[in-house]
């Protein structure tokens, strides 16, 4: 009797990239041309849940997103969030998906800072009170890498502007969002 392989590639890859040495090697090779900027011993597990409640004019909207693998590096008080998205099929809206997931990471951190500022009554000005964010507050960088392991060559967009019908006269007015693709 032979055993069937029922392993799911996405789960195998998530487990592989959770190893700090593999994770650091990947980012160093792909984003830093082999220079060791990330060190395995500096990487810490981070929350993969980006779910959020958005409030606009009294209307609530919930968004649920989970990242595949997320690590955090901390250098004193400063840190960076590093994310991996494994992708087996070409996703023609991947730049938009990355932008949304990165924005949700920033929103999550903003909400944590805003709550702390409100709890501590930390606003020094009306502007800080309004935004619940002090002039000196800063968010931390979020860097995401899409690891595409499909059989076909990636033929999708790698930036938001590649997804847009954009007249030349608007080119400089529309911000772009580029994704890191391997």
Region spans (language model):
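Accessory alpha/beta interaction modules
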Residues: 1-182
């Amino acid at each position: 009797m032979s055993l069937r392989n029922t392993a799911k590639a996405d789960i195998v890859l998530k487990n592989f990239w959770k190893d700090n040495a593999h994770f650091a090697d990947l980012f160093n090779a792909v984003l830093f041309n082999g220079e060791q900027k990330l060190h395995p011993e500096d990487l810490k597990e981070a929350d993969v849940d980006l779910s959020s409640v958005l409030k606009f004019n009294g209307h609530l909207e919930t968004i649920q997103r989970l990242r595949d693998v997320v690590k955090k590096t901390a250098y004193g008080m400063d840190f960076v969030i590093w994310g991996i998205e494994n992708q087996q099929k070409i996703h023609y809206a991947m730049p938009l998906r990355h932008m949304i997931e990165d924005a949700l990471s920033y929103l999550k951190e903003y909400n944590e800072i805003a709550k702390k500022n409100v709890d501590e009554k930390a606003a020094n000005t009306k502007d800080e009170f309004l935004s619940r964010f002090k002039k000196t507050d800063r968010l931390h960088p979020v860097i995401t890498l899409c690891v595409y392991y499909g059989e076909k060559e990636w033929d999708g967009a790698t930036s938001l502007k590649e997804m847009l019908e954009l007249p030349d006269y608007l080119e400089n007015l529309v911000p772009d969002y580029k994704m890191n693709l391997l």
